Amino acid sequence: MESPPMFNSVEDECRYWKERSKQYHKEWTDVKQEYDEFVEQSREMEIEMDATLDQKQSIIKDLTAKLTMFERENESLKLKLESHGIDMSNMEKQLETVKKDRDTMKVYLRQLEQKNDDLERAHRILNESIENFEKMLDQAYEKNALLELEVDEKGLLQEKLQRLMDETRDLKQELNVKSRFTPVVNGTSVPTANDTNTVNSSMNSSASLPNGIVANGELVKHDNAVATRATSVSVNALNGSLVNRNEYNQQHSLKSDGDETEDVPREWSANAAATPLLPAIHTSGAGRTALLLAGCRVVWILQFSVIHKPQIRNPIT
């Protein structure tokens, strides 16, 4: 099949392929016409072959009749064969000698078959031992591959652990630096790391007592309804403050860091005044203690997240 020539334009290419398609269609029609003629001729030949088959069958019948006649002639010839009996006796003697040779060859063949069976048995045992050795070798290869994979995984885990330790050390250093340089907002200092640890320890100590909270030196039964209400109030206040902080960040995204540090406390104070974090709820001593702890924790989280804005570190891949 010849390769298509280079074309100067799409119209030339379309014209070329249209001509080729017409040519192929014409060839297809010619071939189809020839095929139809061939089918018609084959049908005619089939009819002729059927006629010749009938003729041949009649000829076969005639030949069978002749065969029966020749068989009768053969029987007459058998009578002539009896005269050759002497020759047949000689041939029988020779046949006896051949039979003896055949018996000796049978014995030798039987011995060869026994030897062949022994060799096949030994070969089968050898193949089984080879298969066992191959299975043991495959198991050893698999065990070696698993050990190599474990070694590689151990190396990757060690590298990942080292990266995590380095990142933990950097985060600790950054936290120490931020805890040393905490700014003052509207005359109120932001809780430092020690204050955070104090609040967390108080929350943990209160959470570690499921049936009671220490208040004024006495163990008081915990009010589940008041604690649930305080938690919902704190979460709602946190959500409202976070929404207000997002709106503030969108409006003042082009300001400098110094202006942002001065404006955020005022914006947060206005939002805090509009949405009180801890509404006045008259509860028992246990409820007030839970409300105060939850409120302190929410206030510290909001102030620290608005002022400092910690950078998001890239996750370890």
Swiss-Prot record:
Q: Which residues form a coiled coil?
A: 29-180
Gene3D superfamilies given in the database record: 6.10.250.1080
Q: Biological process (GO) annotations?
A: axonogenesis; border follicle cell migration; cell division; cell migration; centrosome duplication; centrosome localization; chromosome segregation; dendrite morphogenesis
Check the record and name the InterPro entries matching this protein: NUDE, NUDE_dom
Q: Which UniProt keywords apply?
A: Cell cycle, Cell division, Coiled coil, Cytoplasm, Cytoskeleton, Microtubule, Mitosis
Q: Name one Pfam family in it.
A: NUDE_C
A GO cellular component annotation here is: microtubule
Q: Where is this region: Disordered?
A: 186-205
Q: What does this protein do?
A: Chaperone protein with functions in nuclear localization. Required for centrosome duplication and formation and function of the mitotic spindle. In postmitotic neurons, acts with nudC downstream of dar1 to ensure correct positioning of the nuclei in primary dendrites and as a consequence, is required for determining multipolar neuron morphology.
Similarity comment: Belongs to the nudE family.
Give the protein's recorded name: Nuclear distribution protein nudE homolog
